[in-house]
Each structure stands twice: as structure tokens, then as C-alpha cells.
């Protein structure tokens, strides 16, 4: 795939245009400037996900992630990118209490990072919050289905859509978020027929972004470390496009062996006298 030459950074409205044009939306997560710089050339938007708590810090869930952590990593991602829209997750506890709390924290994220949008989890019950934010100039990406911040109430990371009435509930969630002004909605961990019904619903104007959902979504997203083969455990929906963990282990092993044997540093890696 060739890199895209572009003079301005993509915005939320561009994802809606891609949906209208039938162009697939490509996304990956990033938490560092250097990885963000690599994916920037190929992604329409880069998500600074609260998954950084698990990927970077070894947390058991995303719940302990703070707003300060999100802002710090989003600043790094913004430095590493120049064309992709950067979307920042609102962490658990930063938007649920009230619409006003959500706006103050979302505004802080946008002001301190320069990112182009925020993402929050939840369906119809957060429609008023989405509307409150969008009316005040905050582009919002929604997130329904398997919502990791609800892991305790869901009883774990469980695929959604198996139960009676789940399709109607999830479709109502997507419609409510879309009607409230969300420019895109992540559909995560939803059984394929239900996800397809939502993704092809003409009443949903927002772009649908799948992760463990359906190819019928307007776009797809994966956690970068998962698709590169760096993570220890990955969900069923992840396809491995690399084996970075094995390559890193091989490189570290070679380094350790050379140091132990006295072969590193060699003459070419030291400074001779003038």
C-alpha cells in the first residue's frame, strides 16, 4: 500500500465523507511518538486508547488509567503525526458524573494535546452527553458493544449480541449516539450478524468502526501491539501481521551474547583519540 501525500491533518468530518464515498476507514492505536509516526502514513485516524494501561503499564483493565496519562501519551502521538486525525479516549471516571464534567475534561484534552476528537464509551444513556459536547465544539466518537470500562458490570470482557433483544438494544444505542452528533462509533466485540445489521443501518449517519465486529463496518481498528505480535495474549478478532516479539527477543539475545563474549562494543562502536 502506498503512502498518502496530504497537506493538512484529517478532521472528524473527513471520516463522515469517507463513509459517504464508500472508502474504508483505517485506524490503529498508538501511544508513542515513534510508532505514531509509522502508522500516520497509512491511517485515517490514530486512537490514543486507554488500552495503554494494559499495553504499556501491565494493568489488568483500563479502569486505573487517568486523564493525565491520556494527555501525556496523546501529546507524544501528536508530535509523531502530521496527517491522521488523532482521537483520545476519555478514561473511566472523567465523563460519567455529568455533562459538565465531560465537557471540562474533554476541553482540557483537546486544549493540552491538540488532538482532533475524543472517544467515550456507552450507548443511549450517554446521548445527552454526546449532544452537549458536540454542541460546544467537541468532536465525539462513540463506542458500544463490549465496552472495556464496564468490565466489572459485564462480568468480564464478554462478546455482546448473543442475548434476546441485544440487536435492538445495540442498534438503539448506535442510533442514539449518531443522532446526538457523534461522527463515528466503534463497534467492539459484537457477534457478526448483529454488528452487520448496525453497520448497514441507513438511519446511522456516523461512520462505524469495527474491532471484533464485522467487515461491513465503514472502517476497522486494531491495537498496534496486538497485530504486530508483541502482546502475550490477543483476542480472537486479532490477525497477526507480524512477529515483533520474536524479533525483539532475537535481537536482545544476540546483544546479551555479544556483551558476555566481549564482542560488543567493537572498534566501530567506540571513539578513537583525535
Swiss-Prot record:
<keyword id="KW-0566">Pantothenate biosynthesis</keyword>
<feature type="binding site">
    <location>
        <position position="50"/>
    </location>
    <ligand>
        <name>Mg(2+)</name>
    </ligand>
</feature>
<dbReference type="Pfam" id="PF02548">
    <property type="entry name" value="Pantoate_transf"/>
</dbReference>
<comment type="pathway">
    <text>Cofactor biosynthesis; (R)-pantothenate biosynthesis; (R)-pantoate from 3-methyl-2-oxobutanoate: step 1/2.</text>
</comment>
<feature type="binding site">
    <location>
        <position position="89"/>
    </location>
    <ligand>
        <name>Mg(2+)</name>
    </ligand>
</feature>
<comment type="similarity">
    <text>Belongs to the PanB family.</text>
</comment>
<feature type="binding site">
    <location>
        <position position="89"/>
    </location>
    <ligand>
        <name>3-methyl-2-oxobutanoate</name>
    </ligand>
</feature>
<keyword id="KW-0808">Transferase</keyword>
<keyword id="KW-0479">Metal-binding</keyword>
<comment type="function">
    <text>Catalyzes the reversible reaction in which hydroxymethyl group from 5,10-methylenetetrahydrofolate is transferred onto alpha-ketoisovalerate to form ketopantoate.</text>
</comment>
<feature type="binding site">
    <location>
        <position position="121"/>
    </location>
    <ligand>
        <name>Mg(2+)</name>
    </ligand>
</feature>
<dbReference type="InterPro" id="IPR015813">
    <property type="entry name" value="Pyrv/PenolPyrv_kinase-like_dom"/>
</dbReference>
<dbReference type="InterPro" id="IPR003700">
    <property type="entry name" value="Pantoate_hydroxy_MeTrfase"/>
</dbReference>
<dbReference type="GO" id="GO:0003864">
    <property type="term" value="F:3-methyl-2-oxobutanoate hydroxymethyltransferase activity"/>
</dbReference>
<feature type="active site" description="Proton acceptor">
    <location>
        <position position="188"/>
    </location>
</feature>
<dbReference type="GO" id="GO:0015940">
    <property type="term" value="P:pantothenate biosynthetic process"/>
</dbReference>
<feature type="binding site">
    <location>
        <position position="119"/>
    </location>
    <ligand>
        <name>3-methyl-2-oxobutanoate</name>
    </ligand>
</feature>
<dbReference type="GO" id="GO:0005737">
    <property type="term" value="C:cytoplasm"/>
</dbReference>
<comment type="subunit">
    <text>Homodecamer; pentamer of dimers.</text>
</comment>
<feature type="binding site">
    <location>
        <begin position="50"/>
        <end position="51"/>
    </location>
    <ligand>
        <name>3-methyl-2-oxobutanoate</name>
    </ligand>
</feature>
<dbReference type="GO" id="GO:0000287">
    <property type="term" value="F:magnesium ion binding"/>
</dbReference>
<keyword id="KW-0963">Cytoplasm</keyword>
<dbReference type="InterPro" id="IPR040442">
    <property type="entry name" value="Pyrv_kinase-like_dom_sf"/>
</dbReference>
<protein>
    <recommendedName>
        <fullName>3-methyl-2-oxobutanoate hydroxymethyltransferase</fullName>
        <ecNumber>2.1.2.11</ecNumber>
    </recommendedName>
</protein>
<keyword id="KW-0460">Magnesium</keyword>
Amino acid at each position: 500500500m502506498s503512502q498518502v501525500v496530504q497537506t493538512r491533518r484529517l478532521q472528524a468530518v473527513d471520516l463522515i465523507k469517507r463513509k459517504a464515498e464508500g472508502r474504508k476507514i483505517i485506524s490503529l492505536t498508538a501511544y508513542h511518538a515513534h510508532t505514531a509516526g509509522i502508522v500516520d502514513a497509512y491511517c485515517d485516524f490514530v486512537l490514543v486508547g486507554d488500552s495503554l494501561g494494559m499495553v504499556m503499564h501491565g494493568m489488568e483493565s483500563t479502569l486505573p488509567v487517568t486523564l493525565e496519562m491520556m494527555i501525556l501519551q496523546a501529546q507524544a502521538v501528536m508530535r509523531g503525526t502530521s496527517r491522521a486525525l488523532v482521537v483520545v479516549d476519555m478514561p473511566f471516571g472523567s465523563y460519567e458524573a455529568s455533562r459538565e464534567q465531560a465537557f471540562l475534561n474533554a476541553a482540557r484534552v483537546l486544549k493540552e494535546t491538540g488532538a482532533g476528537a475524543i472517544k467515550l464509551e456507552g450507548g443511549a444513556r450517554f446521548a445527552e452527553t454526546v449532544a452537549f459536547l458536540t454542541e460546544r465544539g467537541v468532536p465525539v466518537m462513540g463506542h458500544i458493544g463490549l465496552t472495556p470500562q464496564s468490565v466489572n458490570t459485564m462480568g468480564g470482557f464478554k462478546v455482546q449480541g448473543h442475548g434476546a433483544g441485544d440487536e435492538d438494544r445495540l442498534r438503539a444505542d448506535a442510533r442514539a449516539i449518531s443522532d446526538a452528533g457523534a461522527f463515528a462509533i466503534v463497534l467492539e466485540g459484537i457477534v457478526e450478524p448483529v454488528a452487520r445489521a448496525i453497520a448497514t443501518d441507513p438511519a446511522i449517519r456516523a461512520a462505524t468502526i469495527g474491532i471484533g465486529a464485522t467487515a461491513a463496518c465503514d472502517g476497522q481498528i486494531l491495537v498496534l501491539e496486538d497485530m504486530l505480535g508483541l502482546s502475550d495474549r490477543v483476542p480472537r478478532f486479532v490477525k497477526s501481521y507480524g512477529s515483533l516479539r520474536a524479533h525483539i527477543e532475537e535481537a536482545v539475545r544476540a546483544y546479551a551474547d555479544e556483551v558476555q563474549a566481549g564482542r560488543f562494543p567493537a572498534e566501530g562502536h567506540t571513539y578513537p583519540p583525535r
